[in-house]
Design a protein with these regions (language model features):
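Low-complexity/repetitive intrinsically disordered segments
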Residues: 1-16
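Hydrophobic face of amphipathic alpha-helices that form TPR/SEL1-like repeat modules
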Residues: 19-26, 53-62, 91-98, 127-134
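Periodic short-repeat tracts
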Residues: 10-13, 38, 74, 78, ...
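TPR/TPR-like (Sel1-like) alpha-helical repeat modules
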Residues: 104-122, 129
Length: 136
């Protein structure tokens, strides 16, 4: 799979680059390399591929990977969410809920969870319901 993704990525296919990034992030068929995954996700994100923005956001929000930077993660999740990526919206909601990289705001978190839900992510619906039940 890595060779096929590499060939597609070299040919300018964003999905190939994103798939290769996933392989490097998880060490599947290639040696695990978070920096390489980050470079690939950045390439996808810069080219308008919102899944790359989400993948890179996860790398920045997890300090075991490329160095924790919640503000950078929030920017990436925002870009992904603006592009219609449900997981990006939900992840941005989480950052708002816990005040990571952004000022804590439960109403804003709920708004992003709702958008994730509207985009078809059940986890977003669950998170929205949880905050709704708490009165936010």
């Amino acid at each position: 799979a890595a060779q096929l993704f590499q060939k597609a990525c070299d040919g300018g296919e964003a999905l190939g680059c994103n798939g290769l990034g996933i392989l490097y992030e998880n060490g599947r068929g290639v040696r695990q390399d978070y920096q390489k995954a980050a470079q690939l996700y950045q390439k996808v994100c810069d080219g308008g591929g919102v899944s790359g923005c989400t993948g890179l956001g996860f790398l920045y929000s997890d300090n075991k990977r490329v160095g924790q930077d919640y503000q950078k993660a929030a920017q990436l999740f925002q870009k992904a969410c603006d592009g219609g990526e449900a997981l990006g919206c939900n992840s941005l909601g989480i950052l708002y809920k816990y005040g990571q990289g952004v000022r804590q705001n439960f109403s804003t978190a709920k708004e992003y969870y709702g958008k994730a839900c509207d985009l078809g992510l059940q986890l977003g619906c669950d998170n929205y319901r949880e905050l709704n039940e708490k009165g936010y």
